[in-house]
Amino acid sequence: MLTLDGVPFTSVPLKINTSEKEYVDVASLDVDGMVADLLKYKGKSGTACPGPGEWIEAFEDAEYVFCVTITSNLSGSYNAACVAKDEYEKAHPGRKVYIVDSLSAGSEMWLLVEKLRELIQADLSFDEICQKIATYNQHTHMVFSLESIQNLANNGRVNPAIAKIVGLLGIRMVGIAEDGRLAQKDKSRGEKRAISDVMKNMKEQGYAGGKVLIHNCQNEAAANSLKEQLLAMYPGANIRIGKTRGLCSFYAEKGGLMVGFEDGQA
């Protein structure tokens, strides 16, 4: 069990599979090495979600458990966690598990995890935490900018016809997490335009200077540029930069940005 600033915390990893190797999305994964491998790999690849047993193992002996899962519309993780919840609560009367379907991924999920930490440390009741995190989930969003979406297309997450366009002549796909699915909003030519379109889509979803987490896949320069431009408009905003982990690096691919943020009502 890990800790998140004093709160017991662990992750239940998904897996990235090729015919040559399996990559488990844990903190020790060499993400840069995985990205380099996948750039050279020409065969089929895919992902696998954790099963109920892996969730139950992660619950350990906790009285109260809060889970945040990747969107149920793109992964079986949420359903597996629900099965685990039912089995765990049946086996341990009085213990409770609450599952948050993020309807998103990556940086937006991390906003939810950080909010849960805040609520737990405020010593609220289980039911109060459930209510407040459900409300907060309605006011977090994600915008992304991708230089390549081949892995998304290969795994049925986006239209293959769109994948053929993205990457040609410097075109990037800018989109949002909408109702738990990836929705294309712009085809942006060049990184400068893509960053501008990311900011435009953030404003359209109600961004007004709240917390922002910018996760990048080997593109820290773009992440810093976005942060600087946001701070120019919203001085003092809490904006942090991080790196995508295994699963998000697989789908965002080299050069990708995933931007999780709070709207003005969070």
Indicate where each model-derived feature is located:
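N-terminal glycine-rich anion-binding loop in soluble enzyme alpha/beta folds
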Residues: 1-49
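Mixed-charge interfacial surface used for oligomerization/domain docking
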Residues: 1-21, 74-77, 81-86, 98, ...
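Conserved phosphate-coordination/catalytic loops
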Residues: 45-53, 189-193
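Active-site cofactor/cluster-binding pocket
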Residues: 50-85, 89-91
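A glycine-rich beta-strand to alpha-helix segment
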Residues: 69, 98-99
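A short helix->loop->beta-strand "cap" motif at the edges of active sites that frequently abuts
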Residues: 94-95
